[in-house]
Swiss-Prot record:
During catalysis, the active site Cys acts as a nucleophile attacking the alpha-carbonyl group of tRNA-bound glutamate with the formation of a thioester intermediate between enzyme and glutamate, and the concomitant release of tRNA(Glu). The thioester intermediate is finally reduced by direct hydride transfer from NADPH, to form the product GSA. SUPFAM superfamilies: Glutamyl tRNA-reductase catalytic, N-terminal domain, Glutamyl tRNA-reductase dimerization domain, NAD(P)-binding Rossmann-fold domains. NADP(+) binds at G189, A190, G191, E192, M193, I194. Substrate binds at T50, C51, N52, R53, S109, E114, P115, Q116, Q120. Homodimer. The gene is hemA. This is Glutamyl-tRNA reductase. Keywords: NADP, Oxidoreductase, Porphyrin biosynthesis. Possesses an unusual extended V-shaped dimeric structure with each monomer consisting of three distinct domains arranged along a curved 'spinal' alpha-helix. The N-terminal catalytic domain specifically recognizes the glutamate moiety of the substrate. The second domain is the NADPH-binding domain, and the third C-terminal domain is responsible for dimerization. The active site is at C51.
Length: 416
């Protein structure tokens, strides 16, 4: 019997150096979905890849989905199982249902209740839909997760306090520079995280902000909103020495900022310190950059303490959110129980249509060669009734007395 299964590598167990090894870049995701969908016993699949988690959601009838998914993840990223085994989380059936709802509502996020994950989950869903790797069960699962997340947002205060990775990034920079408004900030990338950082920095009255991105039009959109300068990604190395704060979040598959570049920038700055925050997965900044004097390099994992300092207000709403998830999951499980019945009814109706069409075609031919319309129509109706009721009648006769009452409940509806 098929089941829902999830393999997860996330911030709770895996450090950034592991997460970046198993991350999927957007340009390779469609092929990755196709490869996974091609594995025997995988009926449907979705892949979520963010800075804090890589998760594979499948509907499968493999005997050991965990083994299949773990081997797939290791093979596609060309790493050994030993490298990732200690960091794997696996969920199936009810646990999988709870987990996907926890993810969608932000209860499983590094930042409790953060809203960005829901958008990322929806993007993963739409990517799978475009790749044609969904089926009815996985479609229903994700629609359920989305509606549950909406209900949690509506019925609780979990998203009220301004705690997000972008917010905490700006808070962390304030630990290095007391007055952000006097600093020059370089933001690399043009995704949602960078746009949120720009928004928070703008609220801190930062007037000298540079947005660098591979597609300069996307950088320009953010720059226009916050009176910033926009440049292409190839140009950022020529202005990096001007930046007191650098926050990077691109989808690059290899680091774009190396130790040599920063050494050169520090010389031009006469070793004035630089705060650098790498919130990309895989990382945008080589770890060796952090060895340099006057460089304060942080990764997304270093945000945890800032997050904990600001999380108190949301923690109170967590229990209420979990209660909502439990109630919503009961509704989904009820749908899951009757799913085989839906498939049986669909099959029965399809078979009935085949019988009807065959007999109808025969009756039409007879009418063309005979004027006895009434007898032909009566014969057609009798044959159709007999053929449609043959198998159900046979099954009712073979049904035990104990189960007969269930059949009797359906019979009156036939008269309607």
């Amino acid at each position: 019997m098929s089941q829902i299964a999830i393999l997860s590598v996330n911030h709770q167990l895996a450090p950034v150096e592991v997460r970046e090894k198993v991350a999927f870049t957007p340009d390779k995701l469609t092929q990755a979905l196709s490869d996974l969908h091609g594995i025997y016993g995988i009926y449907a699949c979705i892949i979520l890849s963010t800075c804090n988690r890589v998760e594979i959601y499948v509907n499968s009838d493999n005997e050991n989905p965990k083994e299949v998914l773990s081997n797939y993840l290791a093979k596609i990223h060309n790493i050994t199982r030993d490298r990732i085994n200690p960091y794997l989380n696996y969920f199936e059936d009810n646990e999988a249902l709870t987990h996907v709802c926890n993810v969608a509502t932000g209860l499983d996020s590094l930042v409790l209740g953060e809203p960005q994950i829901l958008g990322q989950l929806k993007n993963a869903y739409h990517m799978a839909k475009e790749a044609k790797t969904l089926n009815k069960l996985l479609e229903k699962l994700f629609q359920h997760a989305f509606s549950t997340a909406k209900k949690v947002r509506t019925d609780t205060q979990i998203g009220v306090s301004p705690v997000s990775i972008a917010y905490c990034s700006v808070k962390l920079s304030e630990k290095i520079f007391e007055c952000l408004s006097e600093q020059t900030v370089l933001l690399i990338g043009a995704g949602e995280m960078i746009e949120l950082c720009a928004q928070y920095l703008n609220k801190k009255k930062v007037s000298n902000m540079i947005i660098a991105n591979r597609t300069i039009e996307n950088a320009q959109k953010i720059a226009n909103l916050y009176q910033a300068q926009s440049i292409g990604l190839k140009q950022f190395s020529s202005v990096i020495h001007k930046a007191d704060i650098i926050i990077s979040s691109t989808a690059a598959s290899v680091p774009i900022i190396g130790k040599g570049l920063i050494e050169s920038a520090l010389k031009k700055r006469k070793h004035k310190p630089i705060f650098m925050l790498d919130i990309a997965i895989p990382r945008d900044i080589e770890p060796e950059v952090g060895q340099l004097d006057d460089i304060y390099l942080y990764t997304i994992d270093d945000l945890e303490q800032v997050i904990n300092d600001n999380i108190g207000n949301r923690e109170k709403e967590k229990n209420l959110a979990q209660e909502i998830i439990i109630k919503q999951n009961q509704v989904f499980n009820q749908w899951l129980k009757v799913l085989p019945n839906e498939q049986l009814v669909r099959s029965y109706r399809s078979n009935a249509n085949l019988i009807k069409n065959k007999l109808l075609e025969k009756a039409i031919k007879q009418i063309k060669h005979s004027g006895d319309y009434e007898n032909i129509i009566r014969k057609f109706a009798d044959q159709l009734t007999n053929k449609l009721l043959h198998l159900p009648s046979k099954n009712i006769k073979q049904t035990s007395t104990d189960n007969l009452s269930q059949c009797e409940g359906c019979i009156p509806n036939i008269k309607k």
